[in-house]
């Protein structure tokens, strides 16, 4: 929200936010119910890349592995046979399963971290920004990030528009680059996530 406000201010336009469910967000953009999607979207699938365009990234995120503060888990290799709290339909759940983890089904990150704290699960593989947000809001959670995906596996999130809006993408990208250059994106990342998330 804050990045979108800063971009709108740079462009001299008024922004109206419409909250929607994740599952209907891209369909709403495609149908013209929204002009822009600004919700940590990376456009990684070929289907989305064929339908939508993305501005320069305003944030970067990748997978992180979270375990209790006293855990011996240090990497994905360590979760083989280990109880790992995951949403069964997520990419992270698939990645944990492929690593040989024993999946404990959950509805989301907060439940995953609660199960780890309660020693009903040992780890979770999840999105870095979601975890950083949780840890910023819950500094005494008793869990920590024990492994992070390398920079070349991180995905950049930008402002998303329907394909063919080249002028909008160019304007958004210029504004985002200016916000990087003047330190605004770094400041927002540190304020909300405890670190600069504007760089890969």
Question: Which sequence ranges carry the predicted segments?
Answer:
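Short helix-initiation/N-cap motifs at beta->coil->alpha
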Residues: 16-27, 88-90, 104-118
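Extended ligand-binding regions for polar small-molecule ligands
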Residues: 1-10, 90, 156-195
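Alpha-to-beta junction loops
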Residues: 12-14, 30-39, 83, 118-130, ...
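Flexible hinge/capping segments at coil-to-helix
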Residues: 56, 67-84
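Extracytoplasmic small-molecule ligand-binding "clamshell" domains
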Residues: 1-41
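Short helix-loop capping/hinge motifs at secondary-structure junctions, enriched
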Residues: 69-77, 104, 164-170
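Hydrophobic residues within well-ordered alpha-helices
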Residues: 7, 29-30, 79, 116-117, ...
